[in-house]
């Protein structure tokens, strides 16, 4: 029974770690190393957010979809999970929630960088 319990615990830990590893990746765009979501879409931070707290909801979140964290997702190095007021969870890099941008149409697009002087690419 101990072997089964230990095996199950190891499986659960590896599954949680894989959620983290599958949520984002490093990419090189225009000679710069950045973070993207699993589909290669550029990730951004929002100056109006606080560490560990998203302030992007409603229309903001429609235009800047949060990088959602799966149930059971765990922090990984500089990455953490933020609870949103709508009950969902999202990823944060160095404590800052991260988002994609609706106007980025294909991997490598960086059209959200500098929008309103408050959106910035997450650099790796």
Regions found by a protein language model. Give the residues of each.
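Compact beta-sheet-dominated domain cores in extracellular/mature segments
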Residues: 2-7, 19-124
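Bacterial N-terminal signal peptides
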Residues: 7-15
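Low-complexity intrinsically disordered segments
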Residues: 1-2, 12
